[in-house]
A protein has these predicted regions:
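Rossmann-like AdoMet
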Residues: 1-74, 93, 99
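The AdoMet/dcAdoMet-binding core of the Class I SAM-like
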Residues: 51-132
């Protein structure tokens, strides 16, 4: 099972992408086998394990899937905010979903998620830009 190493074992941070939009700076950085989507001054939005982009590194993201377990056969899902897309990836990988929609405020986020963070171009996934 992946997991972030202790702080004293972390490798140097490598900046992979940086863009500015109306809301500020968006960065993608890599530390070892992990990539992070950051908003603003190193505000970590998402963490992606490169070996499996559907792996949910943080407890709160795993907890967000609990609602899906209450439904015998979920067919659709709506995400208000895409981020790195690893929660979306996990749902597409592990749930029998036919239609998934993500609404993301910042237009560069989906492109960065696909280019650097392992978000797959899945035909079941529709990404819309807008204020959720």
């Amino acid at each position: 099972m992946p997991g972030l190493p202790p702080d004293d074992e972390l490798q140097d941070e490598v900046l992979l992408a940086e863009v500015r939009d109306a809301f500020g700076v968006i960065r993608v950085v890599q530390i070892g086998a992990y990539r992070f989507l950051e908003f603003g001054d190193a505000i970590e939005q998402s963490c992606v394990f490169q070996g499996d982009p559907s792996w949910l590194e943080y407890d709160y993201t795993r907890a967000m899937l609990l609602g899906a377990l209450c439904h015998d056969a979920p067919e659709t899902a709506l995400f208000l905010g895409l981020g790195a897309g690893n929660l979306t990836q996990a749902c597409l990988k592990f749930l029998p979903l036919e239609d998934v929609e993500a609404i993301e405020l910042r237009p560069d986020v989906p492109r960065l998620a696909m280019e650097f963070l392992g978000l797959d171009d899945d035909p079941r996934l529709t990404i819309r830009i807008g204020d959720a």
